[in-house]
Amino acid sequence: MIKVGINGYGTIGKRVAEAVTLQDDMEIVGIVKTKPTYEMKGALDANYPVFASTKNKIPFFESYGINVSGVTEDLVKKADVIIDCTPGKLGVNNMDMYKKAGTKAIWQGGEKHDPIGASFNSLTNYSESIGKDYVRVVSCNTTGLSRTLYPLLNEYGIDNVQAVMVRRSGDPKDSDRGPINSIEPVLNVPSHHGPDVQTVISNLNIQTMAVKVPTTIMHVHCIVAELESEPEVSKVLELWDATPRVNLIEGFLANGES
């Protein structure tokens, strides 16, 4: 069994944990938390060993009646691979700790490509990550772009893509992130999404822009893709329908009528 440790059991980490438990060749040997937030209930219900991020956090957990199995370094030594789900731009700081322990690691979005050295999407460049000790999974927006554009690139060829990301502001619990009642543009052009897609689809010509809006629901992608050929709309829909993890929703209007 592959021993998996999850560093950061929050919005992403709890979903990763659920996926790992569905595998027949993996087991979760522990999760790391900085504080006993509401996500902890899922970890405790699943009987995951809990590790505090640092030693000085252990009494905090114990004051809530939570048994702590150690700290982050202890889990890193125990695991064969760490799934790093810590907040963006923080996870890369853990690389030296993972290397020192000889533990492989996967970063779940939020990090830049260059410090990690390899970016991964299961549909577009799976084989490129085979044998790597350290891999970065691209962000949710990059994943969405990749899963819809890659089939078009393979089947019809793409001359150019222009895309605008309408981004949700954060998760429901992140009330401090905003914007509250505004639309916040990303002033850098291209936004990071286009270059990020190119880390997993290197031959795609793409330019992106983004705005952030006050909702927690979802992201929206507005895409203009210039294909090398002109397929029928029905053929494009059939192609997407056959693509893993792409779902076509039909028959509902915004007002709820069919």
Cite the ranges covered by each PLM segment:
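C-terminal substrate-binding/catalytic lobe of Rossmann-fold NAD(P)-dependent oxidoreductases
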Residues: 3, 14-72, 157-160, 164-258
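Rossmann-fold NAD(P)-binding glycine/threonine-rich loop
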Residues: 88-133
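Short alpha-helices
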Residues: 128-153
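Structural motif
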Residues: 80-81, 104
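A short, aliphatic-rich alpha-helical micro-motif
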Residues: 75-77, 99
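Flexible, glycine/proline-enriched loop segments at strand-loop-helix junctions
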Residues: 84, 131-140, 180-187
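Glycine-rich Rossmann-fold phosphate-binding loop(s) that bind the pyrophosphate
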Residues: 9-10
